[in-house]
Amino acid sequence: MPRKGYTKRQEVLPDPIYNSKLVSRLINKLMLDGKRGTASTILYDAFDRIKEATGNEPLEVFEQAMENIMPVLEVKARRVGGSNYQVPIEVRPDRRTTLGLRWLVNYSRLRNEHTMDERLAKEIMDAANDTGASVKKREDTHKMAEANRAFAHYRW
């Protein structure tokens, strides 16, 4: 408990084109070395590719992808009597979004397509269809939590 109180979390402004805070947060996650213009160009190009490929609204495809990526459970290490246990816990809503965006960007960067906007578009479309590396990461996280269900009573 801090003596001087908690700092208020800074509110993210919605992006100008889709008027979505989630898109704005994705731009921030994509950004390297403070180059927001480059990051937003990559994202909007990826959304154009999604529109061409699926014919659907890219924001809806992205939101569906995020719903398929965001984890509900995760494990946290807890030390009890000299041994560490992986204790399954529920993920808070803000952390769900953060983890989903992080996994989406990281696994997009690991793909083999030529340009980043192509990689991001393919990863978003794969995630919307419940396939892809970021969805696999979520499933692995859920499997870990399920496997360690016996230690759920160590929750704090």
Curated annotation (Swiss-Prot):
Q: Name one GO cellular component term.
A: small ribosomal subunit
Q: Which InterPro entries match?
A: Ribosomal_uS7, Ribosomal_uS7_bac/org-type, Ribosomal_uS7_CS, Ribosomal_uS7_dom, Ribosomal_uS7_dom_sf
Q: Does the keyword Transferase apply?
A: no
Q: Which UniProt keywords apply?
A: Ribonucleoprotein, Ribosomal protein, RNA-binding, rRNA-binding, tRNA-binding
Protein known as? Small ribosomal subunit protein uS7
This protein's assembly is summarised as: Part of the 30S ribosomal subunit. Contacts proteins S9 and S11.
Protein source organism: Leuconostoc citreum (strain KM20)
Q: Which CDD domains match?
A: uS7_Bacteria
Write out the function statement from the record: One of the primary rRNA binding proteins, it binds directly to 16S rRNA where it nucleates assembly of the head domain of the 30S subunit. Is located at the subunit interface close to the decoding center, probably blocks exit of the E-site tRNA.
SUPFAM superfamilies annotated for this entry?
Ribosomal protein S7 (SSF47973)
GTP-binding is among the record's keywords: no
Which gene specifies this protein's sequence? rpsG
Q: Which GO terms describe its biological process?
A: translation
